[in-house]
Amino acid sequence: MKQNIAKVFTFSLLASSISFISCVDNEKNLFDADQLKQIYEETFPVKNIDPDGDWTLSRSVTAHILVNGYEGVNYKIRIFDADPLSSESTAKILAEEDATQGTTLTVAFDCATALNKVFVARIDEHKHYMVQPVVIENGEVTAHLGYTDVSTRSMSRAVTTTGIPTMKAPYTADFISAKKEDATPVEAGWDLSAGPGWFEYAKLPVFKEKIRWFKIPSGIFKAGLKTSGTSGGAEAIKIIVPQGSTWMIENSNQFDNITEIIVENGGIIKIAENATLILTQASYITVMPGGSIMGKGTIYMTNSSAGFTNYNAGIIDCDLLKIDGGGSGVDFMNYGTLKLNSYRASTAGTTLTNHGTIEAVTIDGNNNTHIKNGCYLKTGKFQFGTLVMGNTSEAICEELGYNGNDNDIVMEAQSMLTCTGKASLYRTVTGPTVGTALLRINEIANLSGLAQSNSKVTNNIICEITDQTYKGEAHYDWSPFAWLVNKGLQQGATYCNPGKADFILPADGECIKEGYNSDENPDDVEIRNAVYSYAFEDNYPQAGDYDFNDIVLNVKLPAAGNDVKELKYTVDLRAVGAVKQLGAGLRIQGIDKSNVEEVSFGAGATQRTNSLNSGIFENASYETNGNELVIPLFGDAHYVYGYTGSQRPMLNTGNASTPLTDIYTLEVNIKLKNAISIPSVTDGLDFFIAYQGGAQKRTEIHLNQFNSATANGQLADKEVLEVIKAVNNTWALCVPEKFAYPTETTVITNAYSKFADWAHDQSTNTDWYNTVSSNKVMKY
C-alpha cells in the first residue's frame, strides 16, 4: 500500500493513538468506535454512503425459455448481453443450454445490474441464429423461440386466407354468353342512359328498359360512348365486351353513375396512350377470366363505386389506375393479373384486394386507403394506409414508404413481405400468434422520431435485416436497426441475418413466385465470454488511497448453464499497485469439497505453485482446512511476475509504476463428481486477496457480499466490523466489464464522476464505470 498520501498518513497517526492498527491481532485495549467511524468517514472519498447498498454491480437473473422447432433437431440456446449478429458486435455470452422441440428451459445467469435487456438466441443445426431481444423484468426473462405449428421441413400453400375478403365471381360464363345474345349492339356516339323518347333512341326497345344490356360489336369498335346518369329512366346499364370484340378507347369515354362494363373471355378493351376510361359514382368494371383491358392509357374511377365491387379475373395491363374524389371508397377485387405503371388511390376507404398477381412500378395510396394481399404483389414504391398480408402470400417492393399515422401492416402466417431498398417501420407491424411471418428488409429508413414513437414489430414475425448498422447508446441517437433490437421488436418478434430465417415458403408459380428457404451457410458469430474485473484496496481494515488498483484481476467466466461437471476460469493479474506481498484466492460458495474430483491448472501453473511457497496460502490445488472449496490463485503477486526478495515495484498502474508487456494468466479447471448449475458470479464466486500480518491467520479482503473469512483466514475484529458495517465502506469492487482502473494515487471519484452518485444511492448510476471523467485510468 502506498503511504505517501496525506489522508492515509493522518489516518495512520490517528489509528496508532487508538491501537487500531493492531486490531487484527486482537489488541483492542484502546479501541474507540466513534473515532474510528470518524476516520473512515473522513478518509473515504464518498460521504453519506447508501446504508442499504452492498456495492454489487451485477445481479442474478432467471430465464424461462420455451423452445419450438423441428422434431429431431437439437438446438443451442444462448443468452447474450448485446446483439450477437452485428458485424461490430462485442456481445458476450451469459448462458448456454441445449434444447429440442417443446423444451422449456429455466436457467439462472449473471449480468450487469445496469443491463435491462438480453438477446436470447436459438441456434439450429446449420448454426443459424434466431434472436429475440427480451427485457429483464423483476429479475426474470421470458422468451419464446420458434413457433408451435412447425413440425416438418416442408410447407405448402394454405387453403384459407382468413384476413383477406373473398368474392364469388359476379357472373358465370354461361350467364354472360346467354345475355350477350339478347344484348343490343352499341353504335358510335350513343348515350346509353338516354330516355325512351329521346331522338333516335325512341325506336329501340332497350331504351325503354330499367336495366339495359348492351354489347360491343364484333371486330374493332373505335367510336365513343357514354352514359350520363339516371335522367333517362335507366337504373343500370351493362356493357358486354364479348369474345371477338375489341373496344378501342382513343380519347376519353365517361360512364356516369350506373354503368357496369363486363369484359367476357376473349373480349378486349384497348385504351390508347393519353386516353381514359372514366367511371364515376356507381360505375364499375367486371373482367371475366380470359378478358382483358390493355394499353398505355388510364382507368379513372372517381367519386367511388357506390358499394359496387370492381372485379378482375382476367388481365388488366395499362398505365394508370387512378381512384380519387369523394364517396365511401372503391372496392377493387383482383383474381387475375393487374399490371400497372402506377396505382394511385386517394378516396378514403378504398381497398385493393388481391387474390391473383399485381405488378406495378408504383403503388401510391394515401393514408386512408388499404391493400389486402392474399397472393402475389410486386412493386417499386409501395405506399398505403394499411396493408394486410394474407396466409401464404408474398409481396415484394423496392421502397416501403410512409405517408402518415396508422400505416399499419398485419401479416398472417406464412406471409412474406420483402423490401429490397429502404423500408419505413414508423408503424405497427403485427404478426400471427400461431404460425410465422417473414419481414425481409434491406435497410430500415431513418425517419425522424422513430425512436420516440410507439412503432413496433410484434408477435411471431422474423425480421431478416441486411443493414444491421448499430449506433447510439441513448435512444435519441439510435440508428434504425438499434431502435429495432432495443425497442421495436416486441411480443415474441425475432430477427436474423439475411438468408438465415427459420421459414419455408415454397415457390408455386402462382401466388408464391419467388418463395423462400434459408441457406445452409452458418452465421459468423464470435463467442465471447463475459469478463469481470475485481479491484482491491490492500490496506484493510485501515483506510486506503482508494485508487482500487492494489490488485486488479480480470476473470473470464464460463457461460451459465445447468447440469455441468466442469468449470473453467481464466484469471489475468492485470495490476499490482502495492509494495507488500499480496496473494489471491477463489472461494466458490455452494460447492462442498466432497464433490470435487480434481482442481487443475493450465497456463500459469508453474508460477502459481512457486508463489505459494510464501505461506499465505496452502501450497495445494485447493485448501484442505474447512469444508468450503478455496482455491489459492497465487501467494505472491510480485513473484509471478519474476520479482523476488525485496523487489516489489508497483506494476501496471501508470505514473511511475513499472509497465507490464505480458499479463500473467492462470487457467483454473475444476472437475466435479456430481453435476451442478454454474455458480453465480454475484452470489457464488468469492475472489479475494490476502496478506500475512502479525496474526497466525492471513488477513483477507473480500467483496462486501462475501464478507466472511475462509477457514485459514480472518477479517478485522468484531468491533471494527461493526463500525465498517455502520459506515458501509468497501475495500473491493467487482465490475462486470474490463475495468479501466484508476492510475496510481488517483482517487476513484476523480476518475469516475458518477461513482459518488452511485455510492450515495446504489440503485442509480449502476453503469458509472462506463463514464470516465479523466485520463487517469488504465485502459486496455
Model segments located where?
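Bacterial N-terminal signal peptides that target proteins for export
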Residues: M1-T10
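C-terminal motif of bacterial Sec signal peptides marking the signal peptidase cleavage site
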Residues: S19-S22
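Acidic/polar, low-complexity intrinsically disordered N-terminal segments immediately downstream
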Residues: V24-Y201, Q490-Q542
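Short, well-ordered beta-strand segments enriched in hydrophobic/aromatic residues
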Residues: A63, V555, E566-A575
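Extended low-complexity, serine/threonine- and proline-enriched intrinsically disordered segments
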Residues: G72-S87, A578-S621, D683-A695
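Extracellular beta-strand-rich, repetitive "passenger/adhesive" scaffolds
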Residues: G163-G499
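Beta-strand elements of well-folded, non-transmembrane domains
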Residues: L557-G561, L573-V579, G590-D592
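A eukaryote-biased signal for long
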Residues: S621-Y780
